[in-house]
């Protein structure tokens, strides 16, 4: 049976994911190391993991599998989940797959190296807007339908 795993650290689409999961009657796990208000929705389980590097990521990676959906902005976690057979979405609705995760990992590493080489470089990512939420909702809807055929 399909499950939806949310890497909740800095996730801007938790409430949107909950709405879609509820509509599909899919169990949803919101995984974090704390600071979240638990949902009253019986389909949503808030999982609080101990503090530590990548503990939430490991919890998700250890449990997800074929037919599950993972929402994360963490590219190494996405790679592990894809390897386990899960379908993965970024917060903006972009699907990460076995076909594109290698390039995404390489780009991530390159950008980390560039930032390390120039610590005075200012700037950040673009803000998360209404269009991003809309793309996420559409992407999650399609991905959950696809997952239902796999799991």
UniProtKB/Swiss-Prot annotation:
Record-linked InterPro entries: UPF0178
Protein species of origin: Roseobacter denitrificans (strain ATCC 33942 / OCh 114)
What is this protein called in UniProt? UPF0178 protein RD1_0321
- Hey, which family's this protein in? Belongs to the UPF0178 family.
Matching Pfam families: DUF188
């Amino acid at each position: 049976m399909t499950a939806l795993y949310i890497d909740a650290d800095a996730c801007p689409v938790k409430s949107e994911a909950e709405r879609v999961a509820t509509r599909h009657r899919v169990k949803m796990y919101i995984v974090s190391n704390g600071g979240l208000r638990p949902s009253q929705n019986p389909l949503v389980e808030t999982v609080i993991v101990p503090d530590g590097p990548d503990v939430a990521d490991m919890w998700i990676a250890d449990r997800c599998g074929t037919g599950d959906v993972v929402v994360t902005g963490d590219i190494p976690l996405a790679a592990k989940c894809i390897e386990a057979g899960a379908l993965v979405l970024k917060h903006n609705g972009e699907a990460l797959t076995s076909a594109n995760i290698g390039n995404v990992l390489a780009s991530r590493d390159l950008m980390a190296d560039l930032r390390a080489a120039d610590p005075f470089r200012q700037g950040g990512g673009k803000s998360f807007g209404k269009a991003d939420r809309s793309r996420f909702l559409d992407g999650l809807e399609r991905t959950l339908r696809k997952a239902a055929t796999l799991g």
